[in-house]
Every structure is written in C-alpha cells, then in structure tokens.
Design a protein with these regions (language model features):
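A short, proline-enriched helix->beta-strand linker immediately N-terminal to the Walker B motif
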Residues: 96-100
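Catalytic Walker B motif of ABC-type/P-loop ATPase nucleotide-binding domains
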Residues: 102-105
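ABC ATPase NBD coupling module
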Residues: 10-24, 48
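Short coil-to-helix segment of the ABC ATPase nucleotide-binding domain corresponding to the Q-loop/switch region
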Residues: 36-43
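ABC ATPase "signature
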Residues: 162-163, 171
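Conserved ABC ATPase "signature" region
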Residues: 47, 54-72
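Conserved ABC ATPase signature
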Residues: 77-81, 85
Length: 236
C-alpha cells in the first residue's frame, strides 16, 4: 500500500478522464488499432480531445519526423510495418496530445537487440528534446541503467532502494540489491554510466574509427576490443 501523487495531488482525488488526458501510455504489445492507418493511430487522442484537423495533421507530421518514421508510412497499416516501426508509432501515439507524463511498460521487450538498442537511443534523445517525465517499467537491468536518471528497485511489491544509477551500483542498500545488479558485472555496468567525454585526452591525436563524446565507456571499450587498439580519436 502507499500513495501515488501526480503533480502534487493524490491520484485517487483526480477524475480518471483528467488523468488519462495528462498521461501517455506505451506498452510491450504496442496495441495499435489494426484497421487504422499510422496517421489514424497517432491521431487517436487528439481526435478524442477534438483538436482541429489542421492541428492534428501538423502533430502527426511532427511526431513522425521526431521518431524517424518516413512520410510514406503515414497511410500504411500496422501489419505492413516492422516491429520497430510499430513500436515507434505506439510511442508517437502516446506523445500525440503532449502529455505531462509518459508511462512505458516493457515497451521494447519484444524487439530484437539491434532494434531495441536503436529505440533506447531514440527515447534518450526524445527525453532531452521534450523534457517530459517518463516512467519506464523494465526487467532489463542494462536498459534501466542506460535510460534512467532515477531508479526504483522493487521486490514483491515493496520498494527496496531508489536513487540515481551510480548510487544504486556503488552503495547497494542490502544484499538483494547487490545480487540484483550482479557482483561479477558491476565494473562493466559502471562503465555504462560514464561517457567518453569525461576521459578525452585533448592534447593527443589518433587515427582510426572515431568515437563519439556522448558514447558510454562500455560502448567505447567494445570498439577498442573489436578494433584491437588502445587509442582512438573522438568527435563531438
């Protein structure tokens, strides 16, 4: 038991319809309407809120561009899209009415690793651009560490520990937390929380495939091993 507050108000004191209008929701099964086009799916909530046709069309175009969906997909149906494209449409629909909070329940769990990684990067970019609060439920530890600014770890319905990812990894509250994040993988996961930009030797020059400053040290280490080298250039 406990209390959930939304914008400072206990949610049970707010009308359900008002709550729904202030939140977007994206789930693992996506839940697109199969008989509606991409554009119609994205427009679902704005239409319910009786936006003008012109405003809805502009919002569809804006979100498709934001999520990397080509304009020629606008009139296609869900069965004509890849899994990654369907998930992007699902996120676009969740964002369509510009909600204050985006709820995501295992949104990338059914996708292949490459598509999942690409969408995780997209969500990080979208979060930076829009500044919206995103509440993400996941069982993927690395996904949580990659995406979250604040983590809440639960066990049997109770909060075991919460805090930023670095604190959770380096100062676990108890042995359950320590085991959950993996004793043997702790070092590698810590690399996921630090960026290349913090360790650049700007006075040196190097040749080879360039790293990006925003990359994590974990991704950079992977490239070092794959290329069999100890030094690589960095671009911003």
């Amino acid at each position: 038991s406990g209390v959930i507050r939304f914008a400072g108000e206990e949610i049970r004191s707010l009308p359900v319809l008002e709550l729904r209008r202030r939140m977007g929701y994206a789930i693992q099964s996506i839940g697109l309407f199969p008989h509606w086009s991409v554009a119609q799916n994205i427009a679902t909530v704005p239409q319910l809120q009786k936006w003008s046709r012109a405003r809805i069309d502009d919002r569809i175009d804006e979100l498709m561009a934001l999520l990397g969906l080509e304009p020629n997909l606008r009139e296609r149906y869900p069965h004509q899209l890849s899994g990654g494209q369907q998930q992007r449409v699902g996120v676009a629909r969740a964002l369509a009415a510009d909600p204050q909070v985006l709820l995501m329940d295992e949104p990338f769990g059914a996708l292949d690793p490459v598509t999942r990684g690409a969408l995780q990067q997209e969500m990080t970019r979208i979060h930076r651009l829009l500044g919206r609060t995103i509440v993400l439920v996941t069982h993927d530890i690395d996904e949580a560490l990659r995406l979250a600014e604040h983590l809440v770890l639960m066990d049997h319905g109770e909060v075991v520990q919460q805090g930023n990812p670095l604190t959770m990894l380096t100062h676990p509250a108890n042995d359950f937390v320590r085991q959950f994040f993996g004793r043997s993988e702790l070092g590698v996961r810590l690399l996921s929380l630090r960026s290349v930009a913090d360790y650049v030797r700007r006075e040196e020059r190097a040749e080879g495939e360039a790293l990006e400053e925003r990359m994590t040290l974990r991704d950079a280490l992977s490239l070092f091993v794959a290329r069999g080298c100890e030094v690589l250039p960095v671009v911003n």
